[in-house]
Amino acid sequence: MNGEVIIKAVRPDDAEELLEIYAPYVLKTAITFEYQVPTAEEFHARISDTLKKYAYIKAVLDGETVGYAYVGTFHDRPAYDWAVETTVYVKENCRKCGVGKKLYTALEQCMKEQGILNMNACIAYADEDDGHLNSNSLDFHNHMGYRTVGRFYKCGYKFSRWYDMVWAEKIIGEHMENQPPVRTFFEALPDIRKKYNICL
C-alpha cells in the first residue's frame, strides 16, 4: 500500500462510498449480524444520527476511501454517557495494511476530547475459521489494547450456524467522582484539530 492514509470526518453524503465497503461484510461475513445490505438512504440516516453526538471518520488513500470507523451509544440512559460502542470496517483489499489501526487510533483521540472514558467493542466470534468468520477482529482489538470482559454463547445466527459474541473494553480516561459531561463531536472538533493530525 503506497501513499499516506489521511483521516477525515465523514459526512452523510459519503453514504454510498461507505456502503461499498460495508456491503461485502453483510453479504460474505458474520462480522456483522446484519442480513440485508441497507439502502443508501438508510445508511445516510445512520450517519446523520451518529454525527448528532459522536465522531464518524474515514480513511482516505490517494483520494479513495479505504475504511471508516465510528462509535454509537452504549446504552440510552444518561448514566452510560461516558461509554460508547465502537465500530470499524476496512476495504477488502486494504486489510492488514494498518488502516484499521490508524482509524481506531484517531477514533480514540476523538473520544478523549469528547470526554468518553470507556470504549466497548461487540465482536462476533467463532472458535474456528468457517469461511465467514475468524479471530482477526478479536486479535485486532487485543492488539489495540482492549481486554475481553465477557462472552455470550451462540447468540447470533447467520449463514445457517450460530456465533458467539465477545465484549471487549478499553478504558481511555479517568473515572472521577464529579465527572465532566460529555461533549458532542462538533463541540470537541476545534480541540481535536488543534491537538491531533486529523484532517477533519
Please tell me what each predicted stretch does.
Residues L19-R46:
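Conserved GNAT-fold acetyl-CoA-binding loop/helix
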Residues V37-A83, T87-N93, C110, I171-E174:
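Acetyl-CoA-dependent GNAT
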Residues E4-L18:
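A short beta-loop-alpha structural element at the N-terminal edge
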Residues M111-N136:
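Conserved GNAT acetyl-CoA-binding A-motif
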Residues T87-R95, I123-E128:
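A short, internal acetyl-CoA/4′-phosphopantetheine-binding micro-motif in the GNAT/acyltransferase core
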Residues K96-K112, S135-D139:
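Conserved acetyl-CoA-binding loop-helix of GNAT-fold acetyltransferases
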Residues C122-A124, L138, N142-R161, G173-E174, ...:
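Conserved catalytic-core motifs of GNAT/GCN5-like acyltransferases
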Residues G3-V5, E64-Y68, Y163:
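Glycine-rich phosphate/pyrophosphate-binding loop shared by adenosine-nucleotide-utilizing enzymes
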